[in-house]
Amino acid sequence: YYSAGSEAFDELYDTGASTADIQPGEEVSCYDLLAALLIPSSCEAANIIALNVSDSITGFTDLMNEKAEKLGMENTHFSNAHGLWAQQNYSSCKDMATLCEYAISKYQVFRDIVCLPSYHMASTSYHSDGTDIYNTNLMLDSMTDYYYSYAKGIKTGTLDSAGRCLASYAEYEGTTYLIVTMGAPMD
């Protein structure tokens, strides 16, 4: 279990950041934090993971940038753990596809989580009944017009400065297809 220290929330107040309603002081399992990060884009989950893996968010983003360099991501720089807009936080479709391909091929837990249309986080001292979280990738939700039965997930992202972004993959007749789009109109 990881502790949700108050530092994980400091930069997020009044930003409109996506959340999984994790509270300062709450103890949350690593799996639930990964689900909160990957399903509803929980910014506090990203920071909690960062602060429990490294001594600081800056230290964690240094690790992110080292991994990006090792993967050959030449047009990427991370300056925060959650992906909200920052001057020195950027990437390209090609680089995000590289990262997604790496995660899909290497981590079963990643594949298991990104395909979920929803997830029930375990109960905690702050949420005695647990917390239900819902995926922002509507291709995974059979109740929407966007549903695509071959879709296996990955991640949506939406910022005024970046537009609508989507990293997605599908499996069809033994072949995996991966696509990353960025900058789609907001309307």
For each of these PLM feature ranges, what is it?
Residues Y1-K94, I104:
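Active-site-adjacent loops and short helices of periplasmic peptidoglycan-processing enzymes
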Residues M73-H77, W85-D187:
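Domain-terminus/edge residues, biased toward the C-terminal soluble/receptor-binding domains
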